[in-house]
């Protein structure tokens, strides 16, 4: 067997990240399979794609914050009691999300958000609200899955997490194929992707829960002892989680905001519907080469030696922060290469859209420029993921909150200003998303610099204090000093 000594320190990182990267790519493939389920409906395919895209992006806004509870499981859950607290938080969050789904589907609030704000016609608006109602139970299932995924990642079961996500996608593809041959294609085409989404989530959630009970439940204590930092409180979990949730919520609300401004910019015409459909098709394809980079933020908490549970579990771990930095840079370079190969090589991106999603060539050509803009996303995404992981390790996530605010400000500013420069449609949407990413990453970098300076100053103060203590220790006892002084006085 050929061995590579230079890669010895990187194999644990590769084994950990590859399944997570596959997970992220698998999710994008799942979205494309769902889009194909709609595109296969020849009648009103563009309208159906736009309706589902609006509903799905709004739903992701609610499920986004819950998926970040994966990081709570990764950092905080050391016992059965900790897990019970994390699950309780997610049950409450899932119930709240379901209530919001119902309100938007049936109340005037939903009519205003979807029909009025997005300037879509009555047909698209009613289909979108109906799809949103059908998706009401999804946030709860997604939350349960991500909570257990975080616990599994803490114990280095990233392969199992990856298998669960791949099973999710396989289930989606299979059920899309089955339902396309059912009566739903004629009666309620929207249910084809939605039911497939539910079946995939059910498979993923079941796999992760069974994996937890088989591999982890019996080996973790009922309560966390002092060597593991004690029991985590719900307050600590929520204090750690809310900045990450806010960031992910702004990331997820970015798509609905983009859809809103793009649709309003084109006046709710057929061109607006086409632009939203293009965005719906290009999001998963454009996200595929760089989306897995976000999983880099799980590397620091999983391998950091200052984490009490890692000290116990990884006594032979030789991964250092320098190895993590080099590994992160290589991942970014790989992602950039993939983006430029996929989106700048002639006819490759069109072929992906035609073969995977099932759109026609004319529609695929309209997606080329937005996809090329996605080529520049890996740089800000890598910077954000790497620094976020470091801050998660220090449990200093509160400094990340301003980055989400700046992202929204930059995003909306771009959506308002770029049309005056002649940029419209899907190009306007993706270009503004890139500007938002750059703004967010810049703020995360500034926050990391602030924390680094505080940590450095704290270490210097501790070193100075230890030096003073050492000097005091080297001094002779007070009684001895007194005796010496008295002896000198007697001699004089």
Swiss-Prot record:
Q: Which residues lie on this side of the membrane: Cytoplasmic?
A: 1-85, 153-158, 211-326, 372-403, 453-492
Q: Which residues lie on this side of the membrane: Extracellular?
A: 107-131, 180-189, 348-350, 427-429
Q: Which UniProt keywords apply?
A: Cell membrane, Membrane, Transmembrane, Transmembrane helix, Transport
* Annotated knockout phenotype: Mutant mice develop early-onset osteopenia in long bones associated with diminished bone strength. They show widespread calcification of soft connective tissues due to almost absence of PPi in plasma.
Q: Is the keyword Transmembrane helix in the record?
A: yes
Q: Which disease is it linked to?
A: Defects in Ankh are the cause of a generalized, progressive form of arthritis. In ank mice hydroxyapatite crystals develop in articular surfaces and synovial fluid leading to joint space narrowing, cartilage erosion, and formation of bony outgrowths or osteophytes that cause fusion and joint immobility and destruction.
Q: What is this protein called?
A: Mineralization regulator ANKH
Species of origin: Mus musculus
Taxonomic lineage from the root: Eukaryota, Metazoa, Chordata, Craniata, Vertebrata
